[in-house]
């Protein structure tokens, strides 16, 4: 549409201007003419002519009559406004509007939108997919009730065995069927675990009093181990409807506003978690440390999913393990350095004492051997396994190989015998550990042998395998190089233990590196005249170098652990887990893994033809050294641009996992927290009715009912308070709740 510029001119030179003149760039028209507007798309906007206006002589534009201006502005009554609006819209978009094509609406072929043009309506017979829980697992546990409510302690604090199941947002405890425990001799699942109790719900107090009385007269509850758990869970997986039926339900808890954590104040049993559900507090014991870590994760997932979306908070998981307190850490590091300095001073003092003691022992043993007959065998029960396997002719052959018996040869041989006897006791003390707190009094002999210390495994081999190994082809009636290498290796190992016994106690988790590398001994053959111990000075220097290398390796390992701990974020908001508790669980896991492989390892070692003490000791600890010393021989460029993957040891994995679990003590505050209590269902019918197991409609114990209804309360100082929906956002903040 063409636009024109209008300007109003007035002639003051004596000319009578009888009208306003409109000047245009290309042409000019007068006000009296008809105002027409041409366009390429429409004929005209205003078809009616404008009114003609005559002016007298005016001095300024302000003298114009306002009525005349209103007449110019206001349109005539005959003009249709709707028609004019339609014409304007038609000028803007004359063509009909249609939806664009998908190619123009989405030019990018990467983004794809679903097209439902050819969809058919769903039939009424088609059902939606079945429900699948977010978290679903089960295992065998032992449970101990601590509190029936925040204001009432449990009358019966006995352990009872159950099948624990987590079904998304609730946990269920089922009684264990007798067919699952028939392989366990004298099994006892606890006094509360009684099938007759399911039919008599009115005698709860009498039952708890009777259970407290029977605690002093009956046997302890059986504690499941890893093998029992795997076998029982395998049988449950074959028939879940039978073993996880509603008739076997003992209790059902909702995970809404529940809490779970490590009971750092409880040390009677291992692998235990403390839980708070529906106002009750109880302990749950698992079979091993891996199961404890997994179930802590499962329970936290269920707690995060339990509340509604509008009431749910962002979960605060501990994905980074917390370090211990800096004050306690500095104190521990100071004592560690202090003990290192003392051990170094004591080692220098004891070197001379050990040397003189060895000389006195050798002289005394030489006098004793002169009195004893040559064919008499020692009957001491504490002699080494290797010497007991040798026939009597071995000792005679050792005398004859060096000519006539003199005091020096007798002293050397008696010192070897004494060394080997002491080596056996040292080796047994090396693997000896504290008595386990998880002993079962009603276990059979095979299970007791497997669950005791490693020394019991060795004694069992002594009793059963001594007669069979003496007839093997390894130990002949004559003196053999293999037997002599055994004696030589035992003598060297004993000297190393003897020199370090007073200064540095042996740690069962860290083997001495000098013990691991005893592969350079040369066997002495008959008639060669070589000494049984080759050049003691060179061997002493080699052992000192290996000992220094072992100290460096252990120091590097401690430094690596300290550096890892220094990178941990310190957070004391919810407390921290004591290192003693974590180290205790780690130690139990390492001991249990050692028991699992004890029968296989020692059974195969002592039955092979190339038996040696070196192979026996090298079997348990090569992986630890290879992880620490593997990257030192690589070039700098390879380690910089293609670094080797750092394998996390199992000990570090367990420590980090346990530090990520928040602690929960028995006296953790209840006041100000929101809990859910079981409530009666509404009067109207719902689509999710509660599942009653064995109780009648008049039962008051709603925890024996699946899908029972809940009602929120605030724990006060003297009782429960009613709560509203606003408080759910602050259910974990005590100060905000108490100030409302």
UniProtKB/Swiss-Prot annotation:
<feature type="compositionally biased region" description="Polar residues">
    <location>
        <begin position="400"/>
        <end position="414"/>
    </location>
</feature>
<feature type="compositionally biased region" description="Basic and acidic residues">
    <location>
        <begin position="345"/>
        <end position="354"/>
    </location>
</feature>
<protein>
    <recommendedName>
        <fullName>Uncharacterized protein YNL144C</fullName>
    </recommendedName>
</protein>
<feature type="compositionally biased region" description="Acidic residues">
    <location>
        <begin position="553"/>
        <end position="576"/>
    </location>
</feature>
<dbReference type="GO" id="GO:0005739">
    <property type="term" value="C:mitochondrion"/>
</dbReference>
<feature type="compositionally biased region" description="Polar residues">
    <location>
        <begin position="529"/>
        <end position="538"/>
    </location>
</feature>
<feature type="compositionally biased region" description="Basic and acidic residues">
    <location>
        <begin position="539"/>
        <end position="551"/>
    </location>
</feature>
<dbReference type="InterPro" id="IPR011993">
    <property type="entry name" value="PH-like_dom_sf"/>
</dbReference>
<feature type="region of interest" description="Disordered">
    <location>
        <begin position="525"/>
        <end position="576"/>
    </location>
</feature>
<feature type="compositionally biased region" description="Basic residues">
    <location>
        <begin position="320"/>
        <end position="343"/>
    </location>
</feature>
<comment type="similarity">
    <text>To yeast YHR131c.</text>
</comment>
<feature type="region of interest" description="Disordered">
    <location>
        <begin position="318"/>
        <end position="414"/>
    </location>
</feature>
């Amino acid at each position: 549409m063409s636009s024109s510029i209008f300007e109003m001119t007035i002639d003051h030179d004596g000319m009578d201007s009888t009208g306003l003149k409109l000047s245009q760039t290309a042409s000019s028209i007068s006000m009296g003419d008809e105002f027409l507007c041409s366009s390429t798309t429409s004929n005209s906007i205003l078809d009616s002519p404008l009114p003609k206006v005559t002016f007298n002589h005016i001095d300024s534009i302000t003298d114009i009559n306002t009525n005349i201006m209103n007449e110019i502005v206001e349109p005539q009554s005959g003009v249709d406004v709707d028609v004019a609006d339609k014409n304007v819209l038609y000028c803007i978009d004359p063509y009909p509007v249609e939806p664009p094509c998908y190619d123009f609406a989405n030019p990018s072929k990467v983004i794809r939108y679903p097209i439902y043009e050819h969809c058919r309506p769903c039939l009424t017979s088609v059902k939606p997919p079945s429900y699948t829980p977010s978290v679903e697992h089960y295992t065998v546990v032992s449970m101990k009730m601590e509190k029936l409510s925040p204001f009432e302690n449990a009358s019966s604090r006995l352990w009872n065995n159950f099948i624990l199941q987590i079904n998304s947002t609730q946990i269920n405890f089922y009684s264990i069927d007798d067919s699952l425990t028939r392989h366990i001799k004298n099994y006892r699942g606890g006094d509360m675990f009684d099938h007759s109790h399911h039919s008599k719900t009115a005698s709860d107090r009498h039952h708890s009093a009777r259970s407290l009385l029977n605690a002093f007269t009956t046997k302890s509850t059986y504690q499941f181990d890893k093998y029992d758990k795997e076998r029982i869970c395998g049988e449950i997986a074959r028939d879940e409807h039978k073993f996880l039926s509603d008739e076997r339900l003992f209790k059902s808890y909702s995970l809404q506003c529940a809490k779970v954590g490590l009971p750092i104040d409880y040390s009677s049993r291992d692998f235990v978690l403390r839980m708070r559900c529906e106002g009750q507090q109880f302990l749950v014991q698992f079979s091993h440390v891996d199961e404890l870590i997994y179930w802590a994760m499962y329970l936290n997932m269920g707690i995060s999913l339990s509340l509604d979306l509008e009431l749910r908070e962002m979960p605060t998981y501990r994905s980074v393990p917390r370090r211990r307190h800096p004050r306690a850490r500095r104190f521990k590091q100071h004592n560690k350095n202090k003990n290192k300095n003392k051990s170094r001073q004591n080692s220098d003092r004891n070197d001379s004492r050990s040397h003189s003691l060895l000389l006195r022992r050798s002289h005394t043993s030489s006098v004793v051997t002169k009195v004893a007959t040559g064919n008499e065998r020692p009957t001491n029960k504490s002699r080494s396994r290797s010497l007991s396997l040798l026939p009597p002719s071995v000792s005679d052959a050792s005398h004859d190989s060096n000519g006539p018996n003199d005091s020096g040869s007798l002293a050397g041989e008696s010192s070897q015998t004494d060394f080997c006897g002491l080596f056996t006791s040292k080796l047994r003390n090396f693997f000896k550990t504290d008595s386990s707190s998880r002993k079962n009094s009603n276990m059979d002999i095979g299970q007791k042998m497997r669950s005791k210390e490693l020394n019991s495994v060795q004694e069992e081999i002594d009793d059963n395998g001594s007669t069979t190994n003496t007839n093997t082809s390894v130990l002949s009636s004559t003196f053999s190089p293999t037997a002599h290498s055994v004696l030589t290796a035992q003598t060297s190992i004993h000297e190393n233990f003897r020199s370090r016994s007073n200064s540095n106690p042996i740690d069962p988790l860290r083997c001495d590196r000098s013990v691991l590398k005893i592969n350079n001994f040369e066997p002495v053959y008959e008639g060669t005249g070589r000494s049984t111990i080759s050049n003691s000075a060179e061997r002493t220097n080699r052992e000192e170098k290996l000992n220094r290398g072992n100290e460096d390796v252990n120091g590097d390992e401690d430094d690596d652990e300290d550096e890892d701990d220094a990178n941990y974020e310190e957070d004391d908001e919810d407390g921290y887990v004591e290192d003693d508790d974590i180290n205790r669980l780690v130690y139990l896991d390492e001991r249990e893994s050692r028991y699992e492989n004890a029968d296989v390892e020692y059974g195969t070692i002592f039955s092979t033809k190339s038996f040696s003490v070196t192979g026996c000791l090298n079997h348990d600890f090569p992986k630890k050294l290879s992880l620490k010393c593997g990257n030192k021989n690589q070039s700098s460029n390879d380690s910089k641009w293609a670094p080797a993957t750092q394998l996390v040891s199992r000990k570090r994995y367990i420590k980090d996992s346990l530090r990520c679990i928040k602690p929960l003590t028995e006296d953790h505050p209840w006041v100000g927290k929101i809990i859910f209590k079981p409530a009666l269902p509404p009067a109207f019918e719902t689509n999710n009715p509660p599942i009653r197991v064995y109780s009648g409609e008049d039962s008051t114990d709603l925890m024996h009912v699946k899908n029972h209804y809940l009602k929120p309360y605030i724990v006060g100082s003297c009782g429960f308070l009613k709560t509203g929906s606003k408080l759910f956002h602050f259910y974990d903040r005590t100060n905000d709740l108490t100030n409302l």
